[in-house]
């Protein structure tokens, strides 16, 4: 009998501090940097984002999202066999954020825990990893989290990037099932594009060598993203023997409304099937897809039995898609 990985619970968390474009523009103006709500919205579709307080860590956000997902799943946290955290902004170089989440959740069953780092594709990469563990029969219940505090690596003197990113976390609980859940996944990377989206600094001998802030070549990312997102979505559809017309909802990485709508158009879908949270969340990297998924589940748009396409593209350069029957 075929064994599937099925989402049985979703959860998300946003820090309370919400910063609108007008508020951010006013803060930047004090530093002599010009921007406006109109400029930001026209280029990205973003109207607001959430920032964590200085003493709040990636694992703190992850735990809040995880608690909500576990509650929605209706299982005891001691039943978890594996914890995966997708993040590019971990609490420490090590231990992993996943291990910290395990500890903060009070889980003492010795379940496996590790991080997945694929930047904005991270949640799709982690979901695919969890899917394979469950299909193999190794694990039954897996917690998958995307959590980020990108406000810690934003250069607030660079208006082309500092207006785009926000903090947050989203999570799902996957469980082994005889009923189809995740139907197919597809993952790819091309390291030759590593320099178009990166944090070029590194730690050596107790000091940061190079820049500790995010760098992005926006035009290069845009051009590559629209191309690979269409291809990887079609790859996942082909693997599941489905057509794009059978997709009920598309949840792409919430980076830029123009990229999202461009992908939707290439797939021949209407914008009514596109789940959009980038306007209120900004780009939350690995957290964006599970955040959007949880919003759409909780507001009733996504229903059991519907086909949902998740897809992401991020630094590395990485990209991937997961097609599921919710």
Curated annotation (Swiss-Prot):
First-listed, main subcellular location of the protein, grouped into a coarse class: cytoplasm
EC number(s) from the headed UniProt entry: 2.3.1.180
Record's keyword terms, sorted: Acyltransferase, Cytoplasm, Fatty acid biosynthesis, Fatty acid metabolism, Lipid biosynthesis, Lipid metabolism, Multifunctional enzyme, Transferase
EC category name: transferase
Reactions catalysed: malonyl-[ACP] + acetyl-CoA + H(+) = 3-oxobutanoyl-[ACP] + CO2 + CoA
Pathway annotation: Lipid metabolism; fatty acid biosynthesis
PANTHER family with a match to the protein in the record: 3-OXOACYL-[ACYL-CARRIER-PROTEIN] SYNTHASE, BETA-KETOACYL-[ACYL-CARRIER-PROTEIN] SYNTHASE III, CHLOROPLASTIC
Subunit structure: Homodimer.
Domain comment, as recorded: The last Arg residue of the ACP-binding site is essential for the weak association between ACP/AcpP and FabH.
Similarity-based family: Belongs to the thiolase-like superfamily. FabH family.
This protein's name: Beta-ketoacyl-[acyl-carrier-protein] synthase III
Taxonomy of the source species: Bacteria, Pseudomonadati, Pseudomonadota, Betaproteobacteria, Burkholderiales
